[in-house]
A protein has these predicted regions:
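Solvent-exposed alpha-helical segments within well-ordered globular domains of core cellular machineries
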Residues: 23-26, 50, 105, 109, ...
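Catalytic alpha/beta core domains of metabolic enzymes, predominantly
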Residues: 43-46, 50, 60-179
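C-terminal extensions of enzymes
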Residues: 176-219
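A residue-level signal for conserved active-site and pocket-lining positions in enzyme catalytic cores
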Residues: 37, 134, 207
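Electropositive phosphate-/nucleotide-binding environments in soluble metabolic enzymes
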Residues: 18, 22, 101, 128, ...
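Structural signal for hydrophobic packing residues in well-ordered secondary-structure cores
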Residues: 1, 29-32, 108-111, 115, ...
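Active-site beta->alpha loop and helix N-cap motifs at the rims of alpha/beta catalytic domains
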Residues: 1-54, 58
């Protein structure tokens, strides 16, 4: 819903270089007039994003699992003439016992003192509560599976009020571990931030496995 563009993901593995990603991104950006090229929140992905925005290519930085990655995305894309999207993956953090909505909260808080060129796209939304909390925290965008949209519709399209309280719990009702806010300097070079995160690595590996599986099925 809405007019936020369509994200097209470049093929990457753990050995992909920024120049390879950029070459794919330049081609993909010509496919449709509202394209956003998806790069991962890795060192090479940030290099590709930095070069892309200099060429006025819109980008969506995916597989974000840390506030440091979000700070690096801001710094690497400073000066972009178009909104830059960053996609924190809520559900996958929940899966490992951490409160994924805290990451969205922390990124939004950090960006309060920014120039506003990076927009938060809440990703890996699993529940209506995830969706409502995304609204409450002010995420500009969200990727939502049809099941959650249907549940939200059936509930009458509720929206969070000022007293909305989100409690992060796992499937068994056990509280999720909070993710603490960090005071990070957005004026630092993007290379100074620690981009490493296990879930980003696993996300790339899963993408490669899914891609190869699709190729085998279509052969």
């Amino acid at each position: 819903m809405g007019d936020a563009g369509v994200s097209i993901e470049v093929f990457v593995d753990l050995d992909s270089r920024a120049e390879e990603m950029l070459a794919q991104g330049q081609e993909m950006f010509t496919w449709i007039p509202n394209a956003y090229v998806k790069y991962p929140c890795t060192h090479e992905g940030l290099r590709a994003a930095e070069m892309s925005v200099q060429k006025s290519i819109r980008v969506n930085m995916t597989l974000c699992f840390s506030q440091e990655q979000a700070a690096a995305v801001y710094a690497a894309t400073r000066g972009s003439k178009e909104p830059v999207y960053i996609s924190p993956f809520v559900g996958r953090l929940d899966d490992q016992g951490e409160d994924g909505m805290d990451l969205v909260r922390n990124i939004k808080k950090m960006y309060e003192r920014s120039d506003g060129h990076v927009h938060v796209l809440a990703a890996s939304i699993r529940t209506v509560n995830h969706l409502l909390c995304s609204f409450f925290l002010g995420a500009e965008l969200a990727t939502v599976p049809s099941k959650v949209l249907q549940e939200w519709t059936a509930a009458g399209f509720p929206m969070p009020d000022q007293d909305f309280l989100y409690k992060g719990v796992d499937a068994k009702g056990k509280p999720l571990k909070p993710i603490a806010y960090k005071n990070l300097d957005l004026n630092l070079p993007w290379e100074s931030f620690d981009l490493a995160h296990e879930l980003t690595t696993k996300g790339i590996q899963k993408f490669v496995a899914d891609y190869q599986s699709t190729l085998r099925r279509s052969a």
